[in-house]
Amino acid sequence: MQRTAEAVSIGHPDKTADYISSYILDRIIEQDPNARYAVEVMIKDNTVVLGGEVTTSALLGDLATHVKNALSEIGYDERYATIWGKFAIDPAQIKVINMIGVQSADIAQGVDHDGWGDQGVFVGYACQGEGKINRELFLARKLNKALYEKARQSDNLGIDIKTQITLNDDKIETAIVAIPMLSDEDLTEFVISVLGEKPAHIIINGTGRYTYHGSIADCGITGRKLACDFYSTACPIGGGSPWTKDASKADLTLNVYARILACENLADNDECFVYLSSCIGRNELPSGLIKTIKNGIVSYRDLWCNQKPSTLIKAYGLDKPIYAKLCDKSISGIQN
């Protein structure tokens, strides 16, 4: 049976957008751990649009500086712009359009009383194996991270990287890599060394050339790489994007909680699925279910876990400036 998973680097414009939003949230939380934050980002060429709602006592400061600092952390800095020229974003030319307002009073009246910021259904997953995620996703991420770190040190390779792994049963059938190159570079042996085995097929830059990249080649928008952020095809995706929100938002905190519960309840099962739901303005969870699979036998157990947002926020340190790091790591990169 063939199984395929994809991974993308934070140099990909969609993930760059996620990272910028998460970075700005970190700067706000440093001043105001109780801030309410929901900011979407669009990045195209050298223009960044920020739109959403923020309620905080923090001073936002110069948003353009925050955006440039986030880009620099990713690797889009002055050195990178000098090497790549017209082929990549230039942080010195960044223009920021600010369309940020304040949170709706209708939402605030529930959230301020320790209620969830939205309704929704949330899914957590864990399985046996490295990272407690499906092997094809683990390998796609491992290869992506290795290529990204290599590119950060290179004068020839770019950081907008996509990797895709197809397993046939448990053997690596195909490894696909898209990575910007100023001149051709054979990465075959590097791919094999990272994966620990030789795939039947290795495809690097399938179009033959890949130079224009990042927001110069592709418009990036927050929340568009959820299959990569979550569990690929191993299970349904719950809620919406977690990356543009503070911890009062169920899309973030209950997806984190569902993943942790799945890891905790995996035990000696082959797979564990956790399903949670929320109601806006209420602090109890309307429903919860744990499904486990072991040797083909499926078991179900109701889960009663009326966890308030404040309880989970404190337990997982979600009132700390950890969001950019979490965005890079992904929800399914969490194990405890």
Predicted regions and their residues:
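Conserved mixed alpha/beta catalytic, RNA-binding, or beta-rich assembly cores of soluble enzyme
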Residues: S21-S22, T56, V121, Y210-E271
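Short histidine-centered catalytic/ligand-binding loop motif
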Residues: S9-H12, C127-N134, M181-D186, S241-L252
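Internal helix-turn-beta structural module
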Residues: K44, D268-N336
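Conserved phosphate/anionic-ligand binding catalytic regions in large, soluble enzymes, centered on
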Residues: V8, H12-A17, D114-G129, T211-C235, ...
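A short glycine-rich, hydrophobically flanked beta-strand micro-motif that places a catalytic Asp/Glu
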Residues: Y37-V39, I159-L167, H201-I204, D270-G281
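Glycine-rich, mobile lid/loop segments that gate access to catalytic sites or pores
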Residues: T4, D45-T47, A58, N69-H213, ...
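Short, charge-patterned binding micro-sites
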Residues: A38-S57
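N-terminal, positively charged regions that mediate nucleic acid binding
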Residues: M1-A38
